[in-house]
């Protein structure tokens, strides 16, 4: 009788351990996590990346940990977030490096820890990552230069509202812009170029206003990202004349900038696809974890849009996650 009781107790214990094991296995599967770290969290541009990442996570049953610094120049904070996610043993990291040099050790640490890292939006000076998914930013700068060259008929004085140095994406845009003007439109002169410090829309407004005040007879302006485009547009409105309008080309889709394009307050915008960066970045990590091949570099596309293309279904789809 006693033996029968002990056999029963033993069987119950084994069943309990098996059940706990199954629960733990289920918990592990449910807790698959991918960290997504933008350059900053204040710009609406990064909302597109977040939405794309969340959609991919939902489809693959992965949790998305979204965290980033409040402003893009806070490299130390971004590095700390990468370190924290490594300690959390996330399954992978999607990272938009705020500085192509400063983030190198953090990216290489993910590689050393065998945590797949997909770099999005902006490059980093190492190859110790799974994949790089971004706009061809040099091409974006080329498109902006060609547009401003066209609307100014190859002659005039222009301003450039630049961005924080060592941001690989904006550095490439500005390089493409300047080199294309020099080669294809030698009659156009960049008479002034400044970047906002700190990198806020208010400061972008101030530096644009200062340049417009210092330089008379300006014909055009290029703002190289969403923050500078928003600040430049608000400053520009106070300097426009009915008989001579300063032609502005912006980059990225801030709601007020898209509204300005619709009203004719600026000439055109260069658009990226941040949703695709977030979506494909997460998907690439999951494919890698399944043993599938992942391309080392992916071009996520770039578009020039003018007022007449704003309501094109393709453009509206592109804007949906950004405004």
Please identify what each model-predicted range represents.
Residues 35-52, 56, 65-84, 88, ...:
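Extracytoplasmic "Venus flytrap"
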Residues 45-62, 140-144, 168-188, 203-207, ...:
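Short, solvent-exposed amphipathic alpha-helices that sit
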Residues 78, 133-158, 172, 202-205, ...:
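Hydrophobic alpha-helical segments within soluble ligand-binding/sensing domains
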Residues 86, 94-111, 177, 197-259:
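Hydrophobic alpha-helical
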